[in-house]
Amino acid sequence: MRTHYCGAVTAADVGNTVTLCGWAHRRRDHGGVIFIDLRDREGMVQVVVDPDTPAAFKLAEDVRAEFVLKIEGKVRPRPAGTENPHLPTGMVEVLTLDLDVLNPSLTPPFQIDDETINENIRLQYRYLDLRREPMQKNLKLRYRVSKIMRDYLDTHGFMEVETPMLTRSTPEGARDYLVPSRVHDGMFYALPQSPQLFKQLLMVSGVDRYFQITKCFRDEDLRADRQPEFTQVDLETSFMGEEAIMGLVEGMIRDMMQKAQGIELPAAFPRMSYAEAMNRYGSDKPDLRVTLEIVDVGDVMRDVAFKVFATPANDPKGRVAALRIPGGATLSRSEIDGYTEFVKIYGAKGLAYIKVNDVGQLNEAGLQSPIVKNLSEAALHAVMERTGAQNGDLIFFGADRAKVVNDALGALRLKIGHEKGHVDGRAWAPLWVVDFPMFEYNEDENRWDALHHPFTAPKDGHEDWLATDPGKCLSKAYDMVLNGWEVGGGSVRIHREKVQEKVFAALNIGEEERREKFGFLLDALQYGAPPHGGLAFGLDRLVTLMAGAESIRDVIAFPKTQRASCLMTNAPNVVDEKQLRELHIRLRNPIAADKAA
């Protein structure tokens, strides 16, 4: 139907006849000549319809926004002074010879180029929202990113293998989406949270190098960077250790970002242990572009009169830490109050601070704060020395359980760093976070939980602690972090059945439960399972970062809202009683039951 995309018409086509198809973006009537900006996925070109083609002119008079048009015309230079250097096609226009309205359009609920549209309206009319240039760019970038990674993995000997979407429910840290079985009364499938166990079984099968770009599902509370269904670039390989796997996927990300957007990442990503990341940045996914750092001061606060500091300083699970803000003494009282309210989101009870007016006077004459009188000179000296405080700085303090302090000061570090310009100017700051603990203690249930998942291998020499002191065990896990986002995570897996049994025991998973939920894996590990490991990248997160999008929803064609609903199709929805009977399901909620009747 067409010879060219609208956005592909250039000065090289001057004098040629072209056929274009697209949407009427804008129509203007100037002194008896009609101008139509015709748009398709590749861009826009100006079309001119004059009375010398009366049939086309008559049709053009009735054209409105978003009509679908087919236009045959001759490419000519724009008249001098009317060129548009901001448009790739801005040096030419198409003089219409023939016009056909392929389909009219209702008046759209918003202008396609309106950047202030309410997101709910955008999601309700997603098929119109996707016509907008930013959304088209995001979809193209997403496709290019996935294609480059697929090509890279193919070049490195990986084979794409599909794994099941209907599987069994196994605990992986979030709630499963359950699918009732019609033929197995009272039984359910689960949609996979990841292909984790299947890709390990593929390694046992001798596939050697596997990858898949696949949908995963988690029934969890949503945030800006989460969706109930999301896309993973998933890979697994046999006979490779941590360093080899990290090197391979680091090369993939470097290759992809260079080819997709011309971004040059460093030749080798820095490495940082989990413990160091938490200590210095309060997060296991630190944004290294922010120059502010958290400093421990708990050891010098154990004997101070200020109980807010002394109590957590003497608690093995507590932490007292400081965050220096260069030039922060100029912060107003209202700004400090705002930051105090901000950290309360993360469980902090408040936010103590000291304004440094004269670092040489370790008393109320040189340090402005109601807490100074309750701190010893030795403690104040240690704080000033460790933080590197200078005159005009401000020091914030966190004092609570270690998790609260890390969460609160870690978030505050990012907020102030970006708001006040405490960044180093880099556009991209990748790193690997390594040496994660195997387990974290669940105080509510008085048990150990796997920090990543229960199939992660312990560090060499740590296996013996699984039974005696699980908290000391470190794992062969690694996360790739980019600008404060975890874009990928993986590990070397357990390939020996006896070690897997020990990990299940440390997690208080009894023998009967192990066999019921993971018997197939334990059996497979006894049939010559090779050493193996892998990693999964969140494609949605990665593209969001690269696109500079505000939300992950902006890089997904048909996303769900933060309430896990689709405003366009009204999913989820009720189903009729006949369908429920076939699935052997009766609704206990009377409202839902009435709707289904």
Curated annotation (Swiss-Prot):
Q: Where is this region: Aspartate?
A: 196-199
**Which residues make up the binding site for ATP?**
218-220, 227, 486, 538-541
Question: Quick check: keyword Nucleotide-binding in the entry?
Answer: yes
What keywords would UniProt list here? Aminoacyl-tRNA synthetase, ATP-binding, Cytoplasm, Ligase, Nucleotide-binding, Protein biosynthesis
The entry's L-aspartate-binding residues are 172, 218, 452, 493
**Source organism's superkingdom?**
Bacteria
- Give the PANTHER family listed for this entry: ASPARTATE--TRNA LIGASE, MITOCHONDRIAL (PTHR22594:SF5), ASPARTYL/LYSYL-TRNA SYNTHETASE (PTHR22594)
Query: How is the quaternary structure described?
Result: Homodimer.
Q: Where is this site: Important for tRNA non-discrimination?
A: 30, 81
A Gene Ontology biological process noted in the UniProt record is: aspartyl-tRNA aminoacylation
Does the record's keyword annotation contain Ribosomal protein?
Answer: no
Gene3D superfamilies in UniProt:
Bira Bifunctional Protein, Domain 2, GAD-like domain, Nucleic acid-binding proteins
Tell me a Gene Ontology molecular-function term this record carries.
Answer: ATP binding
Alphabetized InterPro entries for the sequence: Aa-tRNA-synt_II, aa-tRNA-synth_II, aa-tRNA-synth_II/BPL/LPL, Asp-tRNA-ligase_1, Asp-tRNA-ligase_1_N, Asp/Asn-tRNA-synth_IIb, AspRS_core, GAD-like_sf
Gene Ontology annotations for the cellular component aspect, listed alphabetically: cytoplasm
Protein name, entry field:
Aspartate--tRNA(Asp/Asn) ligase
